[in-house]
Amino acid sequence: MTNPRFTIIFATAALIAAPVYAETELSFYFGGQSSPHSVVTGTDPGNDVDDTPDFTAKWEGRSFEAPIYYGWRATRWQSETFGWGAEFTHAKVYSDQETRDEGGFDVLELTDGINILTVNAYRRWPNQFGALTPYVGGGLGISIPHVEVESAGGKTNGYQVTGAALRLTAGAKYAINETWGVFGEYQNTVSFNDMELDNGGALESRIITNALNIGISYSF
């Protein structure tokens, strides 16, 4: 499976190589990310609790434990108010002990991570409050988690492209000068994950993440 870091590098290179009409902005962020419960269904041959699992998983984000939660994006502003770009987020979900006991799993997590890669569109309102520029964005893309599943039926550990992903963002950027800025934002992702297991089974789950991000941006 191709490492998602190479995928985002190629996507960003293609973006920057395109003709620049106005402004290119590179942003990096980290923050606190959580995930609500989600239903997990599928098949897990050899699972000593249920080989056709169907349960609600309780997820933990653990944003500041290695590997930490982070993201970065490249945006091309084609006008003062409209832009588009590519974004990569390294989020994480860990199941709790109760969830693993209920489903018959020793390990059930997407922790390196549940990687979300999207193409986004943005709308901003420049200098709406002095040096503060509010913005909103949304995008479509793919989920590339590092699937870590272990039960009596076997072990799965590796990157997979598991399905579609959606992203919504709302935030504000404070301009330090014409080049550098800092920002804070709320970000939501939804990913539809169909994960293959090495024992021939499969698990499905729609996973939502909610995050409060802070970051720095460089424009040129």
Place the predicted regions along the sequence by residue.
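Strand-connecting loop/turn motifs
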Residues: 21-25, 32, 79-81, 129-133, ...
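Gram-negative (and chloroplast) outer-membrane scaffold detector with strong preference
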Residues: 75-152, 210-220
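Residues that define the transmembrane beta-barrel architecture of outer-membrane proteins
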Residues: 66-70, 113-117, 132, 160-166, ...
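Predominantly the C-terminal beta-signal and adjacent terminal strand-loop region
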Residues: 38-39, 46-53, 59, 176-220
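Extracellular loop and loop/strand-boundary signature of outer-membrane beta-barrel proteins
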Residues: 57-60, 102-110, 150-159, 198-204
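Short glycine/proline- and aromatic-enriched beta-strand/turn motifs that initiate or cap beta-hairpins
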Residues: 21-76, 213, 217-219
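Bacterial N-terminal signal peptides that target proteins for export
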Residues: 1-8
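N-terminal signal peptide c-region/cleavage motif recognized by signal peptidases
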Residues: 17-19
